[in-house]
Every structure is written in structure tokens, then in C-alpha cells.
């Protein structure tokens, strides 16, 4: 089975990932990030990258995926730099 890769975050940070063929979801609010995460998780995504700024608004939603092999939810810094929460996750 082939899995896809998705990225969730603000437009400036995640738009470049389209160059690699990743699915990109723009989210500036927690509700948008939560909806995008649920949508990608319900489809055939093996890895979902989320900017730390978005992840900070939906911590409890992300925690649902802890201990699951798929999808792997990975926090990444945005274009402003790291908040440090990706390292502690």
C-alpha cells in the first residue's frame, strides 16, 4: 500500500511542500487545523506534518494519535522558527 504525506499550517510555512508533491492544508485557526487533521487522518496518509503553531492550538486532538503507527503526526517549525514543542512531543 502506498501512503500519502500531508502538511498542515499557515500558508507561508507549508506552501513550499507542494513542490515535493505533498498535500497541503492551510490552517490559521485551531478549528481549521483540527478539521484538516481529521480529514487527512481518515484518508490514506502515512505521515502528517503540522506546524508547531497549529499544533499548539489542537494538542488534545494530536494526542489521540499517540501510540498509533499510522498516521505518524510530526510537528515542524514554521517560517518564524521553532517554539520548541516539537522537541518535547
Region spans (language model):
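Periplasmic-binding protein-like
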Residues: 46-50
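Glycine-rich nucleotide phosphate-binding loop and flanking beta-alpha elements
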Residues: 55-57
